[in-house]
Amino acid sequence: MSKKILVIGAGIFGCCIAIELNKVGYEVILLEQNSDIMQRASKLNHNRIHFGFHYPRSVKTAKQSLDGLVSFLLNFKDAIVSDFPNYYMNHIDSNVSSEEYLNFCDEVGISYEFEYPKEYLLNRNNIDLSLKVNEPIFDYDILKSTVMYKLMGVDLRLSTKFDGNVDGYDYIINSSYSNVNKINDMLGAPKLNLKFQDVIVPIFKMKHSPLGLTIMDGPFCSIMPRGNRKNEFLLYHPKYSVISESKQVIDISNENEDFLIDKIYKDSTKFYPFLSDVKRNGCWRTIRALPVNYNDARLSELFINNNHPNFITVLSGKVSTCWKVAYEIKSIIRNGVKWKGEIVV
């Protein structure tokens, strides 16, 4: 008899889990409280497909991102954007030295070239290392349309909040990201040790070919292309893009967005002077859920509680691990739950 499985949350992780379970013949119901799939953190981010360069203080995060890379590229090959120069630079006030950063890259096994971006793109004061890398991004629109196509056969229920009813389901998968603790609490499962951030990502336009610029590893800033959109870019500042943070679930604040965006551009222009001449084009807002830790790790993990062996909680890490998580959950359900606690995918 086919198992009936409820997946809560249709972000990229929930969608991939539902797709993979549906492939093997399970009856899958995918709930999403929004009117469409992938409308929050799956969309409202830097669209970076992590090779690991972003996490010099967490080798595990870098290696897990690489481990999931092949499955991500195979499933979403049409959404990959890679034909642009991408630079990772080290600041003298970084959390890691340039030597430590290079040692990290070599340990993880990610390739790079020593090269600086053109002078008009970067204020080189206090930058002691620049690497040109081949790390790609994804185009959200193509990614979403690919996911929608793959979801055929899944019982997708949009604009539907989880009401706590789990009668008749063999397994329940909580992949609701920023609502993960709310769902766990509804079902009497332990909450994860998370912090929640209200995040703003400014969007700007400039007549320039796509490029990526990231200064590591501290209160600096990063610029990435906005998928395949011509002359559009995303700006993120680790300090000023995070409007508020709490260990309790929070909502997007009512603070003046123009004021917040001004702070981001003002500080980022110290590193990228050309930002003073770009055309601002709005922003993205979302709530981000991150694990509380000391080393900046962003691992994808699964949690199974002794009292709820058929209830799996997903802590979503880097996007490249979405299929890896889906395969692991498929294996758990096929073989039965044999492990309780935390599973690093």
Predicted regions and their residues:
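N-terminal Rossmann-like FAD-binding beta1-loop-alpha1 element of flavoenzymes
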Residues: 4-29
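Glycine-rich FAD pyrophosphate-binding loop
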Residues: 23-43
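Central helical "cap/lid" subdomain
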Residues: 38, 170-216, 226-231, 275
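Dinucleotide-binding Rossmann-like beta1-alpha1 core, especially the glycine-rich loop
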Residues: 46-121, 125-127
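Helix-loop-beta segment of a Rossmann-like dinucleotide-binding subdomain
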Residues: 80-91, 114-151, 308-316
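Helical element adjacent to the flavin cofactor pocket in flavoenzyme catalytic cores
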Residues: 131-167, 171-184, 322-328
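Flavin-binding catalytic cores
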Residues: 229, 243, 247-287
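C-terminal catalytic lobe of FAD-dependent flavoproteins
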Residues: 270-345
